[in-house]
Curated annotation (Swiss-Prot):
Residues 452-589 form the Thioredoxin domain. HAMAP family: DbsD. This is Thiol:disulfide interchange protein DsbD 1. It is an enzyme of class 1 (oxidoreductase). Disulfide bonds join 134-140, 191-313, 504-507. The chain crosses the membrane at residues 176-196, 214-234, 252-272, 296-316, 339-359, 366-386, 393-413, 424-444. The keyword Signal applies. It is found in: Cell inner membrane. GO terms for molecular function: electron transfer activity; protein-disulfide reductase [NAD(P)H] activity; protein-disulfide reductase activity.
């Protein structure tokens, strides 16, 4: 039963890990969110000129977590005419498949763009950059244009103000929580958990429990976590010095990283052990044996030494974490993440010190399941890294192989008498194996989405703005919108205003999957239906976005018969049919 609970925990952790092992800056602690939880465009995408001379300009974009830029939407020009641009060679991006727009390339995290130019006189000039991006949660920003004034090869300070506001703005609470949970889970491995009573015997002198035990355990755990934090900060600085995060787009970095994660996974499966060299480990063992227990100083000393004596069960995921942090290039963030990891690893010891061994689970064979679960998770990270290098169908094939291997390991095809717990594990294995078969079939058919391996049946779209004939009125100028709103106000009819653009993926989803839903369709006739097309994204249309405090499409606004907006009902980003139907129902009660 404990193995089953461990595997269920793995299933919960996998999607979290898929989102949290992105080497891209987060923004969940930063400001600038609108009512829908989206960042302003200048906070979602932060461009800066890092270096410039007479022949080149290095332009860097720092994208917040969950936001990406389209490779094909970049445009560059320089002013005045005496300075000219060369042929810009954009780096390869991550393959991004959309049901409507097909295969594109996008940039996550940090991307460096090398822009060649001809400026032999080194005269001042202005670099004009146009770009466009979206949020994973379903918001597309209009094309944005930034101007950088460069004085004879050096960017002015105003042009470089997008370099980031501090570590906390780029590290979300989720990553810290994930590292804490990872550390907590690492404790329940075959090598670490049995050591807890031994360690507590040295630190607590065999007297766990009470306030004294809590203080001594805390004195042991905090220095251990601080050592992990120092290690994480150093790895972050090392990664920053090599600019690994920007280089992470390159197959020459991604493939070795994926190989390292796969190697660590094999170590977690018990095929070999990763340990410190003997000439380092043995002196540390002697120091730990000489440390005095029963005192705060002795507990702190043991905590520091314990952080250096990495056991075989912890070294593989710890090394994987260090690789990840070195790629992030964030010293502060790396320190915080490994501090959280250390706190997670030390939490069971604090629990033991405060309440005694009765509060901790007993060691046993179930802990091998934790170790194997970490191996599967590390393999999943390796596949995730390879997704940036290989084609979509190949990546889907790899996900299928991982799921199939996990299913077979759980005994999916072992039809022999089993206990109830093992039958549940076999059922879980059959689910993994079923997904694996679906992934392989989808890959052979050219699919690439691991969430929908067999693809989704979607209707074709027309080139122009979508509309339901005879119902939706399409608008493109502020004057047209004002006139339509005034007409609806005079008629005493509520208005449903849909913001749309051809380049907005989520707009297509809403048009084809939400507005066509029968529960939504049944309530639409009560409204004057307006659709504002912001595809052109001219200054007048962008001014209209500012007027309504919007960042871009999709968005749906509700207006009362008297012309006032029901702001609590507005939709920003994607929404499903049930959510929109509920808003329509609430609006109907106000008429």
């Amino acid at each position: 039963m404990r193995r089953l609970l461990t595997l269920i925990l793995l299933l919960v952790a996998l999607p979290a890990g898929a989102g949290l092992f992105d080497s891209r800056p987060g923004a969940s602690l930063g400001g600038g969110l609108d009512g829908g939880g989206f960042l302003k465009v200048d906070q979602a995408f932060k461009p800066s000129v890092e270096r410039s001379d007479a022949q080149h300009v290095l332009l860097r974009f720092v994208n917040a977590e969950g936001y990406y830029l389209y490779r094909h939407r970049f445009q560059f020009k320089v002013e005045p005419a005496q300075v000219s641009l060369g042929q810009v060679q954009l780096p390869a991006g991550k393959q991004h498949h959309d049901e409507y727009f097909g295969d594109t390339e996008v940039y996550y995290n940090i991307v460096d763009l090398e822009i060649p130019l001809n400026n032999p006189a080194r005269q001042p000039y202005t670099l004009v950059v146009t770009y466009q991006g979206c949020a994973d949660k379903g918001l597309c920003y209009p094309p944005e244009t930034r101007r950088f004034d460069i004085d004879g090869g050096a960017a002015t300070p105003a042009a470089s103000d997008a370099a980031g506001k501090g570590p906390l703005e780029h590290k979300g609470k989720r990553s810290l929580l994930f590292f804490f949970l990872a550390g907590l889970t690492l404790t329940f491995t075959p090598c670490v958990l049995p050591m807890l009573p031994i360690l507590s015997g040295v630190v607590l002198r065999g007297r766990p429990g009470g306030g004294r035990g809590f203080v001594l355990s805390l004195a042991y755990v905090l220095p251990m976590a601080l050592c992990f934090a120092l290690l994480g900060a150093l790895m972050g600085m090392f990664g920053a010095s090599l600019n690994l995060q920007a280089q992470l787009q390159s197959p020459w970095v991604l493939v070795p990283f994926a190989a390292f994660f796969a190697l660590f996974a094999v170590a977690m499966f018990g095929f070999f052990e990763l340990r410190l060299p003997g000439f380092i480990r043995e002196p540390l063992d002697r120091l730990a044996g000489d440390a005095r227990g029963g005192s705060i100083l002795g507990a702190a000393t043991l905590g520091v030494l314990s952080s250096l004596l990495v056991s075989p069960c912890v070294s593989a995921p710890l090394a994987a974490s260090l690789l990840y942090i070195s790629a992030s290039g964030d010293a502060w963030g790396g320190g915080l993440q490994l501090f959280a990891l250390g706190l997670g690893m030390g939490t069971p010891l604090v629990v033991f010190g405060a309440g005694g061994g009765a509060l901790l689970p007993k060691s046993g064979a179930w802990m091998n399941g934790v170790r194997n679960a970490f191996g599967v998770l590390l393999l999943a990270v390796a596949v995730w890294l390879l997704e940036r290098v290989v084609s979509g169908p190949v990546a889907l094939m790899l996900w299928g192989m991982l799921a199939g291997g996990a299913g077979l390991a759980l005994g999916a095809l072992e039809f022999t008498p089993k206990s109830a717990a093992r039958r549940l594990l076999q059922l879980l294995g059959l689910m993994f194996l079923t997904y694996a078969v679906a992934a392989w079939i989808g890959a052979l058919q050219g699919e690439s989405d691991p969430i929908h391996p067999l693809g989704r049946s979607v209707p074709s779209i027309h080139a122009g703005p979508p509309s339901t004939p005879g119902e939706w009125q399409n608008l493109t100028t502020p004057a047209q919108l004002d006139a339509a709103l005034a007409e609806a106000r005079q008629a005493g009819k509520p208005v449903l205003l849909d913001w749309y653009a051809d380049w907005c993926i989520s707009c297509k989803v809403i048009e084809r999957q939400v507005l066509t839903d029968p529960t939504v369709q049944a309530r639409l006739p009560a409204y004057r239906l307006l659709r504002f097309d912001i595809t052109e994204s001219n200054p007048a249309q962008r001014g209209l976005l500012d007027r309504y405090n919007l960042f871009g499409p999709p968005a749906i606004l509700f207006f009362a018969p008297g012309g006032d907006e029901w702001s609590d009902l507005r939709v920003i980003g994607e929404i499903d049919a049930a959510g929109l139907a509920e808003r329509l129902r609430r609006a109907a009660t106000r008429q």
